[in-house]
UniProtKB/Swiss-Prot annotation:
Function, as annotated: A component of the bacterial microcompartment (BMC) shell dedicated to ethanolamine degradation. Expression of the eut operon may allow this bacteria to use ethanolamine as a carbon, nitrogen and energy source. Unlike its S.typhimurium homolog, does not make BMCs when expressed in E.coli. Targets at least 2 proteins (EutC and EutE) to the interior of the BMC. Proteins such as EutS containing circularly permuted BMC domains may play a key role in conferring heterogeneity and flexibility in this BMC.
Assembly: Homohexamer; unlike its E.coli ortholog the hexamer is flat. Its pore of about 10 Angstroms in diameter is closed in the crystal structure. Interacts with the N-terminus of EutC and of EutE, targeting them to the interior of the BMC.
Protein family according to the UniProt entry: Belongs to the EutS/PduU family.
Compartmental location: Bacterial microcompartment
GO cellular component terms, semicolon-separated: bacterial microcompartment
Listed pathway(s): Amine and polyamine degradation; ethanolamine degradation
GO biological process: ethanolamine catabolic process
Organism: Clostridioides difficile (strain 630)
PANTHER family: BACTERIAL MICROCOMPARTMENT SHELL PROTEIN EUTS, ETHANOLAMINE UTILIZATION PROTEIN EUTS
Gene field: eutS
S-S pairs: none
Chain ranges of the BMC circularly permuted domain: 8-108
Protein name (Swiss-Prot/TrEMBL): Bacterial microcompartment shell protein EutS
Amino acid sequence: MTEESKQRVIQEYVPGKQVTLAHIIANPNEDIYKKLGLVLDKKDAIGILTITPSEASIIAADVATKASNVSLGFIDRFSGSVVISGDVSSVESALNDVLEVLGNMLNFSSTKITRT
């Protein structure tokens, strides 16, 4: 293959303002806690969020922990991932509040909360 026949592909990351995942694992297996590195006395529900731009995960974590009785399990400001834990109703309430603030106050595109 000659230099002239090679194609060059450039991939760009162009973030939008969106919540792409809002999920509740109501009764997680204990292995999930171990694999995530969550060290908690009580194995409650887990809430998962994925947000773009990733810096908004900081806002989501703040809203979630102030809105309800949940613990912050994980936040990654580089990937936009947030993991919270608590009883099912607290996790659901926290996720609803996060979606409300990001969607209505900050004009993010949002998703529905899913559950397993």
